[in-house]
Amino acid sequence: TGNYATRELETFYIWNTATDLATFKQGLQFFDFGSQNWGYADVLGNIAYFASGEFPIREDLDAGTLHGNPPYLVRDGTGGNEWKPLGGPQPADQAVPYEVVPFAQVPQIENPAAHWWVNANNDPIGNTADNDPLDEALAGTGPYLSPGYDEFRAARITELIKSELNLIPTPPGTPPGDGVISMADMERMQADVNQMEGKRLAPYFVGAVDRAGLGGAPAALSSLLNPTIIDARNRLASWTYNAPAGFDTPGDPGTPTAQELVDSVATTIYNVAVGRLMNRTFDARLAAEGIGYRQGTTEGVRGLIRVLSRVPFTG
């Protein structure tokens, strides 16, 4: 929140002498400026994840309603959606003089049954997966944390780990797993170039071309069908969603494989197509309304996924 005095130095003072998970959690109570993701591991084999920070509870969200604009837009300051005042004495380790989501309800996990966990600035509880961060409930409080996260990165890491451990079928463009994760596997994951957003959006372009060749397709769509478009469609359909970077260890890319060439061309087609689609939808509408603002790539991709998942895509 950043509006009140905090005691982060107390956190690190406690951690400097911590010998177990309980003491680590004790120190975490004083890290209140902003919100961070923390990983924990000790010599006894314990692992844990914690989100830190204080999350004030909004009056309207706590009541299960939304009063006016959502909290990620400018809100009406005349009442009805303020931070809830404290219902009792302010805890000694709390910086914000308002009711906050209890620490036990802040995203965290200790010694998960899977023996691993993933975090990459993603939504730690999944409330934004349906493009609505306000429609869940958490023990009577509005569980709102943020309107958006870097979701594809953590999704790909999770997919890679599950694939390497043979928990899921090997995804396209991913080496088969052997049931264990080595240091070499971790290095490969770190250098992964798979484009998860392409996996979500490219099929819409493929489907649009397929529908263009069917009877009854809109004239504006069927008139665009030509050998070049069909070739682009086939390249997208053959894409493993990898975007080859052209560099390899120790710096010599060598001769690209046939699949890498296919993926490189498909990556180019996809990125140009998505950029043009954003330009002709969101950008065009904003310009028509006289709005100079243009959404960033993250917001644009999120918007496309939201719209295309709800409205039939005709191209």
Regions found by a protein language model. Name each.
Residues 43-47, 53-61, 66-72, 117, ...:
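Acidic, low-complexity N-terminal propeptides/linkers enriched in Ser/Thr/Asp/Gly that mediate export
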Residues 10-36, 43, 134-204:
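Proteins synthesized as precursors that undergo proteolytic processing into mature forms
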Residues 30-167, 238, 243, 266-287:
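Hydrophobic alpha-helical segments
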Residues 1-7:
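Conserved, charged catalytic cores of large soluble enzymes
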Residues 1, 22-25, 100-101:
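Short secondary-structure boundary micro-motifs
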